[in-house]
Amino acid sequence: MMSNSSSEIDVVKTRIPTYDEDDDTILYAYETKPEFVNKEPNIVSDASCNTEEQLKTVNDVLIHCQVIYDAMQNLDKKIDVIRRKVSKIQRFHARFLWANRKRYGYKKHSYRLVKKLKLQKMKKNEVYETFSYPESYSPTLPVSRRENNSPSNLPRPSFCMEEYQRAEPEEDPILSRTLSPVHPSDFSEHNYQPYYASDGAAYGSSSGLCLGNPRADSIHDTYSTDQASAAPPSVTRSPFENDGYIEKGSITKHPSTWSVEAVVLFLKQTDPLALCPLVDLFRSHEIDGKALLLLTSDVLLKHLGVKLGTAVKLCYYIDRLKQGKCFEN
């Protein structure tokens, strides 16, 4: 017999007949239903199916993780390429700035040197203001005249350079700017030839007479005829006496043979207002005649730190010097 705890739903109860008529005992046979017999194998198959699904899910997750990893690797490679390009651009920019930096020279690196240069410039300006020039030596600068530099206020007749030139028709062409163009090979061998007027006064006929040397104390656009007639020949001096560093006859040679001091004299005589500030610069760089003829505007602006207007004027005078027309108006 089956226990009472067994469920009647899970089993099949069958009555067993007895052959004893006097016995009232009833026998039953219990059998398990067929559907419950195969129940346990079904549970095992379901578990195996769940395991396969879990493995498939894990594989999918791993595949997605691999895809994400590959994408991150590609992104890192692209970032490295971008960094290399950015660094290349930065190096190119730095090299460009270094190659095109403004070369103003040494004026900005030393306060004492700048102060010294300013004082020298102020002194030169004062010297230029105290002297007058018979004509303008630059196509852009007006003629500057001295109002009154003489201690006496008496009216004095003007002295014309043309009369002086007519008195010496065979004078060296470099002595006057009003004559025709002159080639440097046509210069005379003597810088200073005294000219004696009818009253006995001597006037220097040097090349600095018409070139406006600021330190020449014997050249004026106006002067007193009484004082000139009373002055002895030894009183009037050559304008180059203060320039003791100039070799005799050096300015009359071909420009390619000029020394540094001859080039300095050329700057002073050609355009004192514009070119005299370059005297110290030319001396420090030891620019002689050959170097002067090779100067260009780029060299003056970038390497020597010369201002644009001054560089243009100097290149203009150098071109005229090459053509033999430097002293032509």
From Swiss-Prot:
UniProt-listed Pfam families: SAM_1
Q: What is its main location?
A: nucleus
Residues folding into a coiled coil are none
Location within or outside the cell: Nucleus
Gene Ontology cellular-component terms listed: nucleus
Gene3D superfamilies cross-referenced by the UniProt entry:
Transcription Factor, Ets-1
Instruction: Report the residues modified as Phosphoserine.
Output: S138, S238
Q: Per the record's keyword annotation, is Transcription included, yes or no? A: yes
The segments labelled Disordered in the record are 138-157
Q: Which UniProt keywords apply?
A: Nucleus, Phosphoprotein, Repressor, Transcription, Transcription regulation
GO BP terms: namely:
negative regulation of DNA-templated transcription
One annotated GO molecular function: histone binding
Q: InterPro entries annotated for this entry?
A: SAM, SAM/pointed_sf, SAM_Scm-like
Q: Which CDD domains match?
A: SAM_Scm
Positions of the SAM domain: 258-325
Q: Which SUPFAM superfamilies match?
A: SAM/Pointed domain
Give the record's family classification: Belongs to the SCM family.
Q: What role does this protein play?
A: Putative Polycomb group (PcG) protein. PcG proteins act by forming multiprotein complexes, which are required to maintain the transcriptionally repressive state of homeotic genes throughout development. May be involved in spermatogenesis during sexual maturation.
The protein here is known as Sex comb on midleg-like protein 1
